[in-house]
A protein has these predicted regions:
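A solvent-exposed interaction/effector surface
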Residues: 2-182
Length: 182
């Protein structure tokens, strides 16, 4: 066969290859943005006391957004500026049925702030924690952070305790705090 008799590449094949390439690159970009490739770093530290204003919730941890919305409405009626949104997760979802999971959802406040109407105030005492920070999707972060925290506890001779505290900063970083003991 001579070179003159070869047919030009099929335009449909080229388009399919280009679309496949763009889909792979696009999917990789989305996964990168969500944090799937972001490493989790664990540190051991002692926290300060937190003043926590919250609404109690029972049910799936994946359904906390509506409780955050309710807490946002309560806080918006005041002149209080929270330090950060937060959720205190009281139960282990691998041991407790989803509908019975207990949490407290609200805000970390300055110690001099008054109690916002519609919210309950609790002081979270200083404690020794393993802390993981994650910048990306809270769903992916939750999975990656708690897996890494549990592995770190085992590797370093600590026992993880509850309640876990998740602090959601305005810049998209989530800090996952898990109390630990020997």
């Amino acid at each position: 066969m001579s070179l003159n008799n070869q047919q030009p590449p099929n335009k449909l094949l080229i388009a399919a290859l280009a679309a496949s390439f763009l889909a792979i690159v696009g999917t990789g970009g989305i996964l990168y943005y969500l944090g799937i490739f972001t490493p989790v770093t664990i540190t051991k530290e002692t926290t300060s006391n937190y003043q926590f204003a919250y609404i109690p919730h029972t049910g799936a941890y994946s359904q906390l957004q509506s409780v955050f919305d309710e807490a946002d409405r309560a806080l918006s009626e005041t002149d209080i500026s929270p330090i950060a949104r937060a959720a205190l997760l009281q139960d282990d979802p691998s041991l407790i049925p989803e509908e019975n999971l207990r949490s407290k959802v609200g805000f970390i406040l300055s110690t001099h702030d008054r109690t916002p109407p519609g919210l309950i105030i609790e002081e979270i005492p200083s404690r020794v924690i393993a802390s993981a920070t994650f910048n990306g999707s809270p769903v992916i972060g939750s999975y990656k952070a708690y897996s890494a925290l549990k592995e770190w506890c085992v590797a370093n001779g600590f026992k993880p305790r509850l309640p876990a505290l998740e602090i959601y900063y305005d810049d998209g970083v989530v800090e996952y705090q898990l109390p630990i003991s020997r």
